Amino acid sequence: MGKFITTTLSPPLYARSKLLCFSLLYLFSTIFLFLYVSLSRNQCIFRYSPFDPIQAKLFSYPSSYGEHKYALPTHRSSCSSPIFFSDYWTVLKEIQSILSGSSPKENLRYINGKSESFGGNFSTQKRFSYFNHSNIDVEVPCGFFRDFPVSNSDRVEMEKCGLVVASAIFNDHDKIRQPVGLGVKTLETVCFYMFIDDKTLNSLFHHNVILKNNPSDYRVGAWRIIKISKSENLYLNPAMNGVIPKYLIHRLFPNSKFSIWVDAKIQLMIDPLLLIHSMLVVPEVDMAISKHPFFVNTMEEAMATARWKKWGDVDGLRIQMETYCEHGLKPWSSSKLPYPTDVPDTALILRRHGIRSNLFSCFMFNELEAFNPRDQLAFAFVRDHINPKVKMNMFEVEVFEQVVVEYRHNLKKIESSTYEEQEEEQKQESLRTIQKRRKWLDHESWSLNRSSCKNYLTDMWG
């Protein structure tokens, strides 16, 4: 008997080709979707090529310290103005060449002498009289009318630094956090300095971040710790003491050609050499600073400062704004371009030290001493009125959120260990209590009819 033989017919060639096309289309679509999702969070950051990051941890913190607690989320996943980083080794070579080159012959000359305050406490007219710096032989006020209490050994090391990343923690207000993404040669080229006071040092002792039997040359990972001794030469307000290294960094590090100021509430996530190169060297500017995420006009920031009780002396804020209005403060408009805004986020400041950026920093410090340490309020007035003009790269908020991580300030602080510190803390608390009892905002003070900022407010509100 014959057998039935069953055969399976293969699909025709055109059908197999269509199946292959669909498979490839699915594969490439999946890869594209994966890359898009992976990179969409980082669209502001583009690297030319890989570099060799440091693999080992810079510092191992005790678990009680909590250096990564309370990170603030970012709100922007896209970027209208991305930043491009060149090859690490090319950048390293170029920055080292700049650092080894000769310094400019023209330098600022500073007023020396002694005064009742660290900054000299100059009058309004006197401060503003220095804004037009057309004669390089004229000495300008720039702090240091009292000694800054650092040790001689620290001072010697600070004078050797050619590129510095600096920060400060006073009154145990923040945590020390290590920079991330450093190249293998960065620590040989860049100095990291953290200025702290006694209260912050006691907190570091308490958490065993620094051991008490260590020498006075303290280090925490990348950071060299500079203890600012308690002194009558400084200010009662810890925030004002933090302003000294923030705005007089060119005087504390006189041989530094570049600097990056990092508020202690943020953690640097990109190698500082790449930041300096992409934000200062390539665009050929004096400073780089982020735009404020919400405000464009100085008066908006002033009102928010009063509204959210960021500074308790509302009368002082009103006097400051009226002083600036009387001397020509204007709301932002296209006539101020290439400056895209009047309000920065000053948590991250990059500087190429020179006459223009140093003048701006000096005059900013003078205004902060005269009024308050809220540096966003004086920013536009100083920037718009000084001569020579400072060249600024005011980059997008999205970039800021990619190059740093922001954290909340310390929610719980270590108790002061000495009677003197406790007494000082009680004085500060009494001052804060008095400020809280006041009305946070006197609408009459900001009235269009009574304020010298009437024209400013009319132009701002339309």
From Swiss-Prot:
Its EC number(s): 3.5.1.23
Q: What happens when the gene is disrupted?
A: Increased turgor in pollen tubes associated with altered and delayed pollen tubes growth. Short siliques resulting from severe sterility. Insensitivity to abscisic acid (ABA)-induced stomatal closure in guard cells. These phenotypes are partially restored by the disruption of GAUT13.
Q: Which residues are glycosylated?
A: N121, N132, N449
Chief subcellular site? Golgi
Q: Where are the transmembrane segments?
A: 19-39
Its annotated compartments are:
Golgi apparatus membrane
Give ranges for the Lumenal compartment: 40-462
One GO term in the molecular function aspect is:
hydrolase activity
How does the record say this protein sits in the membrane?
Single-pass membrane protein
Q: Which reaction does it catalyse?
A: an N-acylsphing-4-enine + H2O = sphing-4-enine + a fatty acid
According to UniProt, this protein's pathway is: Lipid metabolism
Question: What is the tissue specificity?
Answer: Preferentially expressed in pollen grains, pollen tubes and silique guard cells, but barely detectable in roots, stems and leaves.
> Some GO term, biological process aspect, for this entry: which one?
regulation of stomatal opening
Family according to the record? Belongs to the alkaline ceramidase family.
Q: What is this protein called?
A: Alkaline ceramidase TOD1
Gene designation per UniProt? TOD1
